[in-house]
Amino acid sequence: MRMKAMRMKALLIGSAAALLAAGAAAQDITGTILIKKRLTRPSVTAPVSVYQRGTAVKLGADAEQDPIAYERSRVVVYLEAAEGPISAGAAVPDAGAKAEPAEQVEQLDRRFVPDLVVIPVGSSVSFPNMDPIFHNIYSLSKPKTFDLGSYDKGETRKVSFPKPGIVEVYCHLHPNMAATVLVTPNRWYARPDRMGHYRIPNVPPGKYTVVAWHKSAGFYRKSIVIEEGHDQSVDFLIPIDVDPTQDAQANQNPNEAGGSH
């Protein structure tokens, strides 16, 4: 029994040492998302809406001061692993890492706020109703199908997402409401800043595909090899000849998307 315990302890120590070594050798992936002009069709809501309970609420129009920065905000960059610790599901230890806060999508003024959230597989999203009316949130997407039923102001319902992919979320009662939950296959993802710069830190050595997804333009992929001691820079040019009405075709499951750009 004592010998078995000693072997188990040695195995645990060896596993921890391997993960720490991977963390020490981890590199950064950085890059820039280049977008030349607006790709998304502006959506404008009516200036005044009367809720079903008779409460008049003023709704603001989508007025973007910086259309290109707005387009960059609709981009997510993440990794798909071919070989290496990420493909095996290993987590690289980070002494300074903090627990990620739960994502939340509010139902506010008959809109989803925000209308795009990114979570790693296995995480959840809360959907609080902030409006003085009922909402009924649902999705028919392959990675996650759900229907939360009707619920009133002040109530919150949560959905977990066990599979990676694109999940389009709608409201049965308000057809204009739409949001997207992008579920990444791991925790190595980033969203660019207003200038289009992104950074994915602590990537272990291995072979990967860097995926850039734009909510209207779809998926773009580049293969890279991360070697110890060498960071990588990967830029993406999002085409300008995209029909913004084709969101449904662009927003397919990344595991089912046909062809790389």
Spell out what each predicted region is:
Residues 26-261:
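Extracytoplasmic copper-binding redox domains, predominantly the cupredoxin/blue-copper superfamily
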